[in-house]
A protein has these predicted regions:
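Mid-domain alpha/beta scaffold segments of enzyme catalytic cores
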Residues: 2-140, 152, 254
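Conserved, mostly hydrophobic/aromatic
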Residues: 27, 59, 82, 111, ...
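Mid-to-C-terminal alpha-helical segments outside catalytic/metal-binding sites
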Residues: 1-22, 48-66, 232-234, 247-296
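Catalytic pocket-lining loop regions of alpha/beta-barrel enzymes
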Residues: 3, 126-237, 286, 290-292
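A short acidic, helix-capping loop that chelates divalent metal ions and anchors anionic groups
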Residues: 36-41, 177-181, 209-212, 244-247
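Short, glycine/acidic-enriched loop or turn micro-motifs at the edges of active sites
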Residues: 28-30, 175, 243
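Active-site phosphate/pyrophosphate- and oxyanion-stabilizing loops and adjacent acidic/basic residues
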Residues: 56, 83-84, 158, 191, ...
Length: 296
């Protein structure tokens, strides 16, 4: 029997941090409605609906004007739910899909035209990377987004990441357990990637690799600060809402955003993380914040 991911925190708390116009949440997922977009079979777990409308409510509460929807493992390589969200919110949203080698150029163009700018590769799904697919997606202006956990997986994909054509993105700060420290082989691999000038890292999912079960995940701060110090122009923030496959105390998304005040005390650096860096990576119109704000 599959586990069911608990729903996200339902608190209506707003963040203390006042984000600038154009602020972007660069990592979240949309589930359902399953009546229209059923999950694939087989799948690793189940989840309740966390729809586009739910996401838009969260964006308003956090003060976000834009966002990047990331394909979830619950949909496999069926990007229909993602495509629907992008078409309904073309100014506000961009996407990261999950496609396979057999995808046609026509299908890739359809996804690109809708706002897809990257493809997520999951070590857990397949440790073998299709480099030909990465090269092909590069021709469409997409970047590879690498999702892995721990030192051995980081090392296994190191050469592939460094050989990526153009920009590439690393999920969840590289997901290195905090107990291993800043000098671990895994975290040094992430820093080596950042130093290429082509790597971007998502400041997301601190709960997943912290040794602490609840906010503020204080042991993550040195890792986040080191990533920001190394490449302030190539780090972006993501909520990871609705936090799939998480069975410990559910983090509050407003308080996750507030962690940026500690990770990046300088307001100008936070503005890069939240506005300027996402604009450059995902192709939002420069300086354009979505004026069509949604209300609860």
């Amino acid at each position: 029997m599959r586990k069911i991911t608990p729903p996200p925190d339902s608190s209506i708390l707003k963040p203390i941090l006042q984000v600038p116009p154009g602020a972007t949440d660069c990592h979240f997922h949309i589930f359902g409605p399953q009546s229209a977009f059923p999950f694939v079979v087989p799948r690793p777990l189940d989840a309740t609906d966390c729809s586009l409308e739910d996401l838009l409510d969260l964006q308003v509460r956090l003060g976000m004007d834009r966002g990047v929807a990331v394909q979830t493992a619950l949909y496999g390589s069926d990007n229909s739910c993602l495509l629907d969200a992008l078409r309904r919110e073309p100014k506000r949203l961009r996407g990261v899909a999950a496609v396979q080698h057999a995808i046609t150029d026509k299908q890739l163009k359809e996804l690109t035209d809708a706002g897809v700018r990257g493809n997520r590769f999951s070590f857990m799904r397949s440790p073998d990377i299709d480099r030909d697919l990465i090269a092909r997606l590069h021709e469409f202006g997409w970047h590879p987004q690498y999702w892995f956990e721990g030192e051995q997986q980081a090392l296994a994909w190191k050469d592939t990441m460094l050989d990526s054509p153009g920009n590439f993105v690393i999920d969840h700060m590289g997901w290195q357990p905090c107990g291993l420290g800043l000098n671990s082989i895994g975290f040094r691999t992430i820093l080596e990637c950042l130093e290429t000038g082509r790597c971007w890292v998502k400041l997301s999912g601190p709960n997943r690799f912290s040794m602490e079960d609840v906010l503020p995940y204080s042991d993550v701060a040195p890792f986040a600060q080191k990533l920001i110090e190394t490449a302030p122009d190539r780090v972006i923030w993501g909520s990871d809402w609705p936090h799939p496959n998480w069975f410990k105390p559910m983090p509050n998304d407003a308080r996750l955003l507030d962690l940026l005040m500690d990770w990046a005390p300088d307001e100008s650096v936070r503005n890069k993380i939240l506005v300027e860096n996402p604009e450059g990576l995902f192709g939002f119109n420069l300086g354009e914040a979505n004026g069509d704000h949604h209300t609860n």
